[in-house]
């Protein structure tokens, strides 16, 4: 028996940051090394995401238990993977894909396959005595490592908050800095400044699922203006040090072919009108990135949005592409969007996640590695962002340990690698 051989795999039900069950998996090697990873969980999900398997037993965790998925790991997946070398990531992942045999992993559950896939990578890195980011880099021959620009979600609306704001996330991107640690400091200072701005206006400073504030505001635009006020208070310059980013999550307010902004008196827009509305915001404010500006099924609308904004800012497909190489390829062919959000639980294995990242890179699309609104202390996405030189990471606000765990891991990686922080150079139209 060789030391890198998988001798056991164990999964358990743990809790995520919302108090809902999720899966944690351990991959155990002959050498005694144990790799551990947890699957995250989303709130606003794309309809073509790989399936997160839940038990549906209302008497237990309100139907959200994951015992079935845990059992799939402890029996079917374990039986198929024990005896394999942990260094064969592609073989491990492909075995699970074949075992499942469905397009969206509905048999085993993407939460089951992902936890095992990531735990195997962690075990492999530990067995080689190298950091996880280095192991991920070596999987695809990535020789240059970079620190990602953080996309920090500081005001929440939509399905991430119980307020009257339609756009789901208002974010800051600290682009005008020479290191990740300085960029992080700027983000934290602006976050605290925003709290005082909201306090002075008598607005709520409770935080949402991802640690951003969720005040009731008069309009979506007011969220932008309070953030600009907070940036100004800290002495940083919006438009040079700090850029803004939006995640519309517009599938959440797309009804019968129209985009309906409930927070603005149920104002209804056609696809092109909503694109023009977004273009108006871009002209008026220092916005460098818009995610899911239109519904995931509105390919024609996306085409128009890309034609008017695609050479000016980053247009990120999340619900649109769901980290799926096949769907991304369609986007590339039809010139839709210019960036992809990478959420590995949308696809269910590390190998397929890397396929999506490198397909995007090879076709000039930027990549943003992302958390989910239901997270754990697992910080794998930090290593993934550096190990693929993705360029950007989206992992929430500057509070809640489920978010900060990723930022802290990035600080450790920066200290270890001295990897470059490219800031503005990551964006079209900013260099």
Swiss-Prot record:
The catalytic residues are: 210 (proton donor), 343 (proton acceptor)
* RNA-binding found in the keyword field: no
Task: Write the Enzyme Commission number(s) for this entry.
Answer: 4.2.1.11
Q: Which SMART domains match?
A: Enolase_C (SM01192), Enolase_N (SM01193)
State where (2R)-2-phosphoglycerate binds: 168, 343, 372-373, 394
Question: Where, in this chain's numbering, is Mg(2+) bound?
Answer: 247, 291, 318
Q: Where in the cell is it found?
A: Cytoplasm; Secreted; Cell surface
| UniProt superkingdom | Bacteria
- Bound cofactor: record note: Binds a second Mg(2+) ion via substrate during catalysis.
Q: Does the keyword DNA-binding apply?
A: no
Query: Some GO term, biological process aspect, for this entry: which one?
Result: glycolytic process
What PROSITE patterns would the database entry show?
A: ENOLASE
Query: Sorted alphabetically, which InterPro entries does this protein's record hold?
Result: Enolase, Enolase-like_C_sf, Enolase-like_N, Enolase_C, Enolase_CS, Enolase_N
The UniProt keywords, alphabetically, are: Cytoplasm, Glycolysis, Lyase, Magnesium, Metal-binding, Secreted
Q: Which GO terms describe its cellular component?
A: cell surface; extracellular region; phosphopyruvate hydratase complex
> Where does this protein act, in terms of pathway?
Carbohydrate degradation; glycolysis; pyruvate from D-glyceraldehyde 3-phosphate: step 4/5
Q: What is one Pfam family matched by this protein?
A: Enolase_N
Q: Which reaction does it catalyse?
A: (2R)-2-phosphoglycerate = phosphoenolpyruvate + H2O
**What family does the database annotate?**
Belongs to the enolase family.
Q: What do we know about how this protein assembles, alone or with others?
A: Component of the RNA degradosome, a multiprotein complex involved in RNA processing and mRNA degradation.
Q: What does this protein do?
A: Catalyzes the reversible conversion of 2-phosphoglycerate (2-PG) into phosphoenolpyruvate (PEP). It is essential for the degradation of carbohydrates via glycolysis.
The name this protein goes by in its record: Enolase
Its gene is eno
């Amino acid at each position: 028996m060789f030391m890198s051989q998988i001798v056991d795999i164990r999964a358990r039900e743990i809790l995520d940051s919302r108090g809902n069950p999720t899966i944690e998996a351990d991959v155990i090697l002959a050498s005694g090394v144990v790799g551990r990873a947890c699957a995250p969980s989303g709130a606003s999900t794309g309809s073509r995401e790989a399936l997160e398997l839940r038990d549906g037993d209302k008497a237990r965790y309100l139907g959200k238990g994951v015992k079935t998925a845990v059992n799939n790991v402890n029996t079917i997946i374990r039986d198929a993977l024990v005896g394999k070398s942990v260094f064969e990531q592609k073989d491990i992942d492909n075995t699970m894909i074949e075992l499942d045999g469905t397009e969206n992993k509905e048999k085993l559950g993407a939460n089951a396959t992902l936890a095992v896939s990531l735990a195997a990578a962690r075990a492999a890195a530990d067995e080689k005595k190298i950091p996880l980011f280095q192991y991920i880099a070596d999987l695809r021959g990535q020789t240059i490592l970079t620190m990602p620009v953080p996309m920090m979600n500081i005001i929440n609306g939509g399905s991430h908050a119980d307020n009257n704001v339609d756009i789901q996330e208002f974010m800051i991107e600290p682009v005008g800095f020479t290191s990740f640690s300085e960029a992080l400091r700027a983000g934290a200072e602006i976050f605290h400044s925003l709290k005082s701005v909201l306090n002075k206006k008598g607005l709520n400073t409770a935080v949402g699922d991802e640690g951003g504030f969720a005040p009731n505001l008069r309009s979506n635009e007011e969220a932008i203006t309070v953030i600009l006020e907070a940036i100004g208070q800290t002495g940083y310059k919006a438009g040079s040090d700090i850029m803004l980013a939006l995640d519309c999550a517009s599938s959440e307010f797309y009804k019968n072919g129209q985009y309906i902004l409930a927070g603005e008196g149920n104002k209804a827009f056609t696809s092109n009108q909503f694109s023009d509305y977004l273009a108006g915001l871009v002209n008026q404010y220092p916005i460098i990135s818009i995610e899911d500006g239109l519904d995931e099924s509105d390919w024609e609308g996306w085409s128009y949005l890309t034609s008017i904004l695609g050479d000016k800012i980053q247009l990120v497909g999340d619900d649109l592409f769901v980290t799926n190489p096949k769907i991304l390829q369609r986007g590339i062919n039809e010139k839709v969007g210019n960036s992809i959000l990478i959420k590995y639980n949308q696809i269910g294995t590390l190998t397929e996640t890397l396929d999506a990242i490198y397909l995007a890179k090879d076709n000039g699309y930027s990549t943003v590695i992302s958390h989910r609104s239901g997270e754990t202390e697992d910080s794998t996405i930090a290593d993934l962002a550096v190990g693929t030189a993705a360029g950007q990471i989206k992992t929430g606000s500057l509070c809640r340990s489920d978010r900060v765990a990723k930022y802290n891991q990035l600080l450790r990686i920066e200290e270890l690698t001295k990897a470059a922080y490219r800031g503005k150079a990551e964006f079209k139209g900013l260099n």
